[in-house]
Each structure stands twice: as structure tokens, then as C-alpha cells.
């Protein structure tokens, strides 16, 4: 035991045969013996491989680390363990969160079989490392003043929890906890005048250290603003106001270039780097925040709002699309022109689709209230058109991913960010079919919804979130007497417990009965459409009461939003 954290080094397969069963039996890994946090790490060769996979397959989703520094931290950690020296809990938590996120995203096609026997084993390890990371973070919050590594670990862990659960209370608590720790470390005034900072904060930071803090801060802030326009209980609210921070944007530079140029230098966004996606995401988030500031509260009378304001807000999304560098555009000519860039930065392919999925999901969300009110004002046809175009763009991204990424596409389709937008896009198509029967061929529109549901169905084999989304859609549609698939064929999937401690950090003293067991979140093979009579199922759409008020449809959308959290 070192600094209240007991660490054992075990090969993955050995750990699953011993440590995993002990955790399952005890109900809490931290309750065994007298240690505060009891964890296991893979041997150094497996750890090195996992970090390499993280650098290639995960870090571009949230580029908040300086990988050369993390590699050195891991080297130091294993050296300290071998010599029995004191270890820092924040370093253990960061390494565990990296391993968890890597294990979750691995597939046999990305080399996952080098450490894990199969995909389910990798998900089990992601589950176990996530819970251990929560234990260590809780211990670190009680025994240390906090560090940038604690924040980084919390962000990465929230990514894993988000993919396991969705917008649950645990995910939101982790995100809020990361922001709280960041404010405690004065990250929100990182670039204020040094003589106005209390104590020896920013002046002692290295240029690279300050740049990483900017990445961390703006990742959290952009996530906060994007979620404000994403549905769910947090819709219409955000935690960080731009007037309450003094933090420069991160620079558009690769890690290897951070110490090659002066601290003010940044490449233009037309030049691709590992940070270009992050900076575009920040721009998109700022549009979302501006929309939230300009919109009336969700409970307002939408019939009395200034529709011209909505159009101007929507046109900001359109302007953002026009401003995208060529390697982030979706049209075939731009993608063909970007092949050399994709060869240099392969992650741009995935980033492009995540950015567009997020963009179109938020644009659809902005126009969604008017989708159900087209009959009230002919001008609202503009919002219906935009809403449907955005929804169909999200759904068509799957085909583009299949084309550009071939067999690797399935691994990224199961990412919660993509699934969430795909789910809501499908709901938009369903609502429009029910409300606007003159909007085109009914049979074609029915088929596109069935095809979209099949994508969610196919993702269920490896994504607990896809199963929850499909079940939520079926349950809500059944409640409103709208049926596409037999709802009883979709298995019940329990989310991770949302219990949190007094600090806002998820309580690590939870029994594993409150946690999703990986064997439970991977449902057995089934086909909800296999025995379905499509004509009979769709008759429920045709017979839907057309006299439902717009408010009733608002409640339906709200129900769909609430069921994903």
C-alpha cells in the first residue's frame, strides 16, 4: 500500500480470473482490508500497449493530454511501484481512466486481441478500471489539494461513463466535479494578469503546462455549452459564463510543436493539426451558448416568440458550415481532396463525422419546437425543412462512415455522442411522419425510419446505450400509441447507479449491485424486426390522432429527452 492506494500488477487475464471475481464477491473493491483504494494495473508491456492504443484511437476525441508527459508519468509510476516508493493517487487515477477508455473503444480489428481475448473481456476491463478510477479519485479528493491530473482523469472517466450510461446523473456529476476542481485550481483565470492572481499560480507554469490547462478548460466549457442545447434536464442551462473566465483558446498545434514556437503562435484552422477539431468544437459550442442566451425558456409559449430570431440563430449554424476547412466538409469533392490530410491525420475522418453529427443534432434541436407547429404558421416550414435535413444528415453519416472507414465504422457508431444524435434524428423523422402526412411518399418515409431503427438494433451487440435508446424510443412511442417494433422484444437495461457523494463526485462506496455488470449490458442476440408485420405495425402511425396539440408533441419530445438521461 502506498499513500492509501493499494496497487497490484497483474496481467489482464490473470486479473479477470482473480481480482475481478473478488470484486464481484465483495461488492466493493475498497472494502477489502484496510486500504482506501484497492486497484490492479496491467504489467508494463500491456500498459505501454494500452497507452499506445489510446494515443492512436481515443485521445483525438478529447485532446486534453500532453502525451509525452503522460508516457513519462507512466514510466515513473511503474518504477515507483517496482521500488515500493510512494505513488500519487492522481497519477494512478489518470492511468486507470486511460486504460478504461482504451478498453471500451477497442475491437479485434483495432488490435484488441493483443491483450483481451474478446470484445466482451475488453468491456469488462473498462467497467472494472472505471470503478477503480472512481475509488482513487474519491481518495485523491480527500487526501490531496487536487491536480490537473485529477481533472484529466475525471474528464476521461466521464467519457467512459457517458458511453456506458448516457446523460445520467453520474455523468453530469463527474462533469460538474471536473469544473469545480478546475476553478479550485484557478484554471478559469489562467490568462488573467499574473499580478492579479492570488498566490504563485500561472507564473510558475511552463508554456506546455499552461497550454494543456487551456485544452482541459475549453474541453469542459465546450461540453457544458453543447449539452445546454441537447435536451434532458440540463437543457437551456449551462454552468460557465464567458464573462466569468479569462482563458485563451488553445493553440492549433500538435504536441511536438508546443515547444518549437513562441507561446503566442498558432496555425490557422485551414492547416490541419491534432487540435483543429477541438477548436472547431469550441466554435460550435459558442453558437450553442449564444442560442441558449437568445431563446426563451423551454416552458415559454412558443407561439408568441420572435421567429426571425430563430432564423438568424439557425443561419449562424449555416455560416459555421460554410467556414469549415475543406478537410472537415462532408461533400464528396472535399473528402476526395482531403485524402492526403487523412493519411497524415487519420483521426480526422472520425472527428469529421462526430462534428457533423453534433452540429446537425444541435441545429435540429433548435428548430424542433416548430416542427410540430407548421400548421400554425406557414413560415415554420423553414424550420421543418431544416429539422428534417439535419436529421437525415445525421442518419446518412452512418453510410458515409461505412464507406470511408469500412470495418472500423462499427466501433465508432457505438460512441454515445453519435448514438445520441442518431436516436434523436430518428425521433424527428417519426414525429414528422405522424404530423405531416403530405410531406412525401409515406412508404419511403416509413422505410427510412425502419432502417434507422435497424442501425440502433445492430449497435446493441456492443453498446448498452444503443439498447437503451431503442427501448426508450419504443416505450415512448407505445405510450403515445405509435408502434414501429414490438417493444417487448427489447431487453431491459439498467443504467449505472446515479448515487453521488456530498462532494458531487460519484460515491465509490457503492455495491456492484448498483453498477452495470458488463455481462448484463451486452444483450443476447435477437431481432425485433424478424417476426414483425411491417404493414400492421405502421397502421398505428396512420391512425394516430391528428388533432393532438403542439403542446402534446412537446411533451412527447420532452419524454424522449428525459428517457435518455
From Swiss-Prot:
Name of the protein this chain belongs to: Probable transcription factor lepB
Q: Where in the cell is it found?
A: Nucleus
Annotated gene: lepB
Q: Does the keyword Transcription apply?
A: yes
Principal location = nucleus
Q: Which CDD domains match?
A: fungal_TF_MHR
Q: Which UniProt keywords apply?
A: Nucleus, Transcription, Transcription regulation
Q: Does the keyword Hydrolase apply?
A: no
Tell me a GO cellular component: nucleus
Top-level taxon of origin:
Eukaryota
Q: GO biological process: what's one of them?
A: DNA-templated transcription
Q: What is the lineage of its organism?
A: Eukaryota, Fungi, Dikarya, Ascomycota, Pezizomycotina
Q: Name one GO molecular function term.
A: zinc ion binding
Q: What is the role of this chain? A: Probable transcription factor; part of the gene cluster 23 that mediates the biosynthesis of a family of 2-pyridones known as leporins.
Gene inactivation phenotype reads:
Does not affect the expression of the leporins cluster.
Record Pfam families:
Fungal_trans (PF04082)
The UniProt annotation puts the region (Fungal specific transcription factor domain) at 52-259
InterPro entries (alphabetical): Sec_Metabolite_Reg (IPR050613), Transcription_factor_dom_fun (IPR007219)
Amino acid at each position: 500500500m502506498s499513500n492509501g492506494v493499494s496497487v497490484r500488477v497483474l496481467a489482464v487475464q490473470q486479473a479477470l480470473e482473480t481480482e475481478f471475481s473478488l470484486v464481484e464477491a465483495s461488492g466493493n473493491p475498497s472494502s477489502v482490508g484496510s486500504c482506501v483504494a484497492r486497484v490492479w494495473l496491467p504489467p508494463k508491456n500491456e500498459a505501454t500497449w494500452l497507452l499506445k492504443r489510446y494515443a492512436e484511437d481515443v485521445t483525438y476525441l478529447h485532446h486534453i493530454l500532453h502525451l509525452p508527459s503522460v508516457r513519462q508519468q507512466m514510466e515513473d509510476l511503474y518504477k515507483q511501484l517496482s521500488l515500493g516508493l510512494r505513488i500519487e493517487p492522481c497519477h494512478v487515477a489518470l492511468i486507470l481512466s486511460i486504460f478504461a477508455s482504451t478498453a471500451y473503444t477497442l475491437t479485434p480489428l483495432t488490435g484488441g486481441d493483443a491483450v483481451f481475448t474478446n470484445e466482451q473481456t475488453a468491456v469488462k476491463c473498462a467497467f472494472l478500471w472505471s470503478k477503480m478510477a472512481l475509488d482513487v479519485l474519491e481518495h485523491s479528493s480527500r487526501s490531496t489539494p487536487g491536480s490537473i491530473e485529477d481533472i484529466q482523469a475525471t474528464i476521461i472517466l466521464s467519457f467512459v461513463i457517458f458511453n456506458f450510461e448516457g446523460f445520467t446523473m453520474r455523468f453530469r456529476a463527474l462533469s460538474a466535479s471536473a469544473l469545480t476542481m478546475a476553478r479550485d485550481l484557478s484554471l478559469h483565470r489562467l490568462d488573467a494578469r499574473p499580478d492579479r492572481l492570488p498566490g504563485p499560480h500561472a507564473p510558475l507554469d511552463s508554456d506546455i503546462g499552461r497550454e494543456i490547462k487551456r485544452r482541459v478548460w475549453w474541453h469542459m466549457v465546450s461540453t457544458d455549452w453543447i449539452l445546454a442545447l441537447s435536451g434532458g434536464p440540463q437543457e437551456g442551462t449551462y454552468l460557465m459564463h464567458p464573462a466569468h473566465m479569462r482563458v485563451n483558446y488553445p493553440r492549433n498545434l500538435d504536441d511536438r510543436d508546443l515547444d518549437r514556437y513562441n507561446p503566442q503562435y498558432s496555425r490557422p484552422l485551414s492547416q490541419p493539426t491534432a487540435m483543429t477539431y477541438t477548436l472547431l468544437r469550441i466554435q460550435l459550442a459558442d453558437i450553442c451558448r449564444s442560442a441558449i442566451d437568445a431563446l426563451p425558456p423551454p416552458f415559454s409559449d412558443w407561439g408568441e416568440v420572435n421567429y426571425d430570431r430563430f432564423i438568424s440563430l439557425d443561419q449562424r449554424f449555416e455560416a459555421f458550415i460554410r467556414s469549415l476547412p475543406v478537410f472537415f466538409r462532408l461533400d464528396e469533392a472535399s473528402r476526395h481532396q482531403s485524402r492526403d490530410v487523412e493519411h497524415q491525420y487519420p483521426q480526422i475522418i472520425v472527428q469529421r463525422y462526430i462534428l457533423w453529427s453534433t452540429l446537425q443534432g444541435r441545429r435540429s434541436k433548435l428548430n424542433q419546437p416548430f416542427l410540430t407547429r407548421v400548421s400554425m404558421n406557414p413560415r415554420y416550414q423553414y424550420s421543418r425543412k431544416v429539422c428534417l435535413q439535419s436529421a437525415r444528415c445525421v442518419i446518412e453519416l452512418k453510410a458515409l462512415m461505412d464507406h470511408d472507414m469500412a470495418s472500423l465504422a462499427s466501433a465508432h457508431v457505438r460512441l454515445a455522442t453519435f448514438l445520441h444524435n442518431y436516436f434523436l434524428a430518428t425521433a424527428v423523422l417519426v414525429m414528422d411522419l405522424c404530423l405531416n402526412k403530405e410531406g412525401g411518399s409515406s412508404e419511403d418515409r416509413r422505410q427510412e425510419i425502419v432502417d434507422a431503427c435497424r442501425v440502433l438494433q445492430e449497435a446493441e451487440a456492443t453498446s448498452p446505450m444503443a439498447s437503451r435508446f431503442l427501448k426508450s424510443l419504443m416505450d415512448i412511442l407505445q405510450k403515445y400509441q405509435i408502434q414501429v417494433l414490438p417493444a417487448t422484444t427489447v431487453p431491459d437495461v439498467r443504467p449505472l447507479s446515479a448515487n453521488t457523494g456530498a462532494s458531487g463526485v460519484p460515491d465509490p462506496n457503492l455495491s456492484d449491485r448498483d453498477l452495470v455488470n458488463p455481462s448484463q449490458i451486452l444483450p443476447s442476440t435477437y431481432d425485433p424486426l424478424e417476426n414483425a408485420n411491417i404493414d400492421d405495425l405502421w397502421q398505428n402511425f396512420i391512425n394516430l390522432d391528428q388533432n393532438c396539440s403542439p403542446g402534446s408533441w412537446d411533451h412527447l419530445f420532452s419524454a424522449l429527452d428525459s428517457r435518455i438521461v
